[in-house]
């Protein structure tokens, strides 16, 4: 039996039962699938989290993102979804993503 948790207010999904092989980041005009094998580290706090992979950096801004940081550290996150324009300005939820950006890292 698989346990998949999805909360529309959080804009991210986790899977606690299976080994996750990749993180899917869905933006308004593009989708990235980043393999967990290339995950280096995550850093941040309640209002911003950065997840760094070998060639990309995922920057998430919002509220209550400490829970996302913990989920990333455990590599349980299957999906991070950029909110729609209308959802970006909600203020009643205690956890939500306001903005997601994916940047390609410079090579030396």
Each language-model region and where it sits:
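Helix-rich interaction surfaces within compact, conserved domain-sized segments
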Residues: 60-108
């Amino acid at each position: 039996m698989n346990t998949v948790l999805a909360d529309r207010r959080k804009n991210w999904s986790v899977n606690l039962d299976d080994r996750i092989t990749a993180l899917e980041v869905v933006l308004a005009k593009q989708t990235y699938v980043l393999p967990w094998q290339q995950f280096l580290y995550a850093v941040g706090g309640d209002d911003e989290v950065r997840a760094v992979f070998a060639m990309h950096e995922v920057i998430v801004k919002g509220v209550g993102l400490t829970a996302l940081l913990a989920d990333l550290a455990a590599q349980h996150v299957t999906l991070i979804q950029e909110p729609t324009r209308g959802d970006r300005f909600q203020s009643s939820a205690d956890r939500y993503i306001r903005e997601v950006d994916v940047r390609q890292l410079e090579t030396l």
